[in-house]
From Swiss-Prot:
F(1)F(0) ATP synthase produces ATP from ADP in the presence of a proton or sodium gradient. F-type ATPases consist of two structural domains, F(1) containing the extramembraneous catalytic core and F(0) containing the membrane proton channel, linked together by a central stalk and a peripheral stalk. During catalysis, ATP synthesis in the catalytic domain of F(1) is coupled via a rotary mechanism of the central stalk subunits to proton translocation. Component of the F(0) channel, it forms part of the peripheral stalk, linking F(1) to F(0). The keyword Chaperone does not apply. PANTHER family: ATP SYNTHASE SUBUNIT B (PTHR33445:SF1), ATP SYNTHASE SUBUNIT B', CHLOROPLASTIC (PTHR33445). The lineage of its organism: Bacteria, Bacillati, Mycoplasmatota, Mycoplasmoidales, Mycoplasmoidaceae. The chain crosses the membrane at residues 28-48. This is ATP synthase subunit b. Belongs to the ATPase B chain family. It holds the Pfam family ATP-synt_B. It comes from Malacoplasma penetrans (strain HF-2) (Mycoplasma penetrans). Keywords: ATP synthesis, Cell membrane, CF(0), Hydrogen ion transport, Ion transport, Membrane, Transmembrane, Transmembrane helix, Transport. It comes from the Bacteria. One of its GO terms (molecular function) is proton-transporting ATP synthase activity, rotational mechanism.
Amino acid sequence: METINNVFDSVISLQSAIPDNSQIINQIFPNVYVLIAHVISLIFLLLLVIRLAWKPTKSYIEARTKEIQRKMEAAEKAQLESEKNLHISRIKLLESKNTAAEIIENAELDAEKTKKKIEAVALNKASQIESEGYSKIKKQELELEKRKNLEVSKLALETAGIFLSKKIDEEENKKIIDDIVNDLTAKLESSSKEK
């Protein structure tokens, strides 16, 4: 209980320490002249703050705003310029791709033409070589035919000479013909080996 009494005593002592309303007003505004002096000094202080602090701050803020606006306009201009340059570079890239495609296409066409020319020249040379080979073969065949005819005519003359020089009976006729055939076969084999 004693604690409750102590609390009440402290509350009562606080109330007595707080001055009443009239005392507060008298302490703040002891008289009207002091109040007027305070108001005038407050107005002077406000004017001084406006003159010395607000106006330079306001002009600094305006200058800073103008600077920011100028930089934003420059950034927008630079962005427009970069977009324009990007568009131009894309167009140039597309033109380069088209030019490269044309160059490749022309190169392929030129390669195809060159290939056809080379094939035509090769076919022409092959045809020429073939005709030369064919003519050489024909020439060799003609030579062989001439040799064969000469051999046959020589053989025929020899045979005729043998027949005319000898008395021919049937058995000797067969023997002479066999000798001539064997001789002719040997000569043909030797001439084919020479080739």
